[in-house]
Amino acid sequence: MKITKVKIEKFSAPLKEPFRVAFGVIEDADSWTVKIETDEGIYGLGSAAPLAFVTGETMDTCYIVMKMFADAFIGFDPMDIAGAHKLMDSIIYSNGAAKCAFDLALYDIIGKKKGLPVYKVLGGTDPVVHNDITIGINAPEKMEADAKEYVFEKGFRILKVKVGNDASLDALRLTSIKKATPAGTVIRVDANQGWTPKQAVRI
């Protein structure tokens, strides 16, 4: 099997409300989608979600790198994951979002070729993904209200709570959410590099 065509398209979705984290505010969910087609009619889909302060990539730079990959992958065997990683690394260092999109699309092709879901291709045994939902930085009462909505109305049992812009206020945010949710609710704390090591230990 050989790769015959690679398509890259932009996807943008406005968020219901601005999403605040320690390093900034995000108002739109922007990403690139890649579709890798093969000579056997099997195709794979992948997605790149670059964020400059996380991956060092912007939407523009990510597209440029993905175009480089797209040209290099024509004629390549999509079943060769190790070779694909070596090829991408030989083209450019880092750029994890762009590489992720192609990695995902190739695994999608492999799964379809083998007639298996990707989690089994990767050696997994549990078909259920236990996901969290993220609560952005806001006033403590707003974050508490969001936590209640996600747990009691939407059924989430794992909350990822963004903090990091004010350590003293962060403690109040986390305490409020902990008190407002039932025992057994998993709370993951993500300060996005906004705390010092001492603050992290103290909180």
Question: Where in this protein do the model-derived segments appear?
Answer:
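N-terminal amphipathic alpha-helix/helix-capping segment at the start of soluble metabolic enzymes
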Residues: 1-10, 21, 112, 116-127
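Metal- or metallocofactor-binding catalytic centers and their adjacent structured scaffolds
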Residues: 5, 37-113
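Conserved active-site and cofactor/substrate-binding residues in soluble primary-metabolism enzymes
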Residues: 29, 60, 64, 79, ...
